[in-house]
Amino acid sequence: MKRYSVCVGDTVYVLAGNDKGKQGKVLSCLREKNKVVVEGVNVRTKNIKRSQENPKGKRISIEAPIHVSNVRLSIDGAPAKLSVKVTENGRELWNKSPDGTSKLYRSVKERKG
């Protein structure tokens, strides 16, 4: 299974699609489908049928998943390029700034199995 540079709770920047340029928080990662659900992005309207609980029925808005390649981690309000370096105690994600310097963003332990 592919490892992502974004995880639940991160703020991401949308790179492509109808919501290009928007930012939002990652609500969930669907790793088997390579998709993420982002708060306030790719909002769809769903119709709920009439039932005894909802005699009139209703319409609700839900966030639909988007492909992980269409989002990038947002650092200081702009999309950031991250490079992955593997160390002896796990994986580290480095943020490359425009001036050429690198700064440690996150250190992640590898999962077994």
Swiss-Prot record:
Tree of life domain: Bacteria
GO cellular component, as recorded: ribonucleoprotein complex; ribosome
PROSITE patterns: RIBOSOMAL_L24
GO biological process per UniProt: translation
Annotated signal peptide: none
Pfam families in alphabetical order: KOW, ribosomal_L24
InterPro entries: KOW, Rib_uL2_dom2, Ribosomal_uL24, Ribosomal_uL24_CS, Ribosomal_uL24_KOW, Translation_prot_SH3-like_sf
Keywords from the UniProt entry: Ribonucleoprotein, Ribosomal protein, RNA-binding, rRNA-binding
A GO molecular function held by the record: structural constituent of ribosome
Binding partners and assembly: Part of the 50S ribosomal subunit.
Entry similarity comment: Belongs to the universal ribosomal protein uL24 family.
Protein function: One of two assembly initiator proteins, it binds directly to the 5'-end of the 23S rRNA, where it nucleates assembly of the 50S subunit.
Protein name: Large ribosomal subunit protein uL24
Species: Chlamydia caviae (strain ATCC VR-813 / DSM 19441 / 03DC25 / GPIC) (Chlamydophila caviae)
Gene designation: rplX
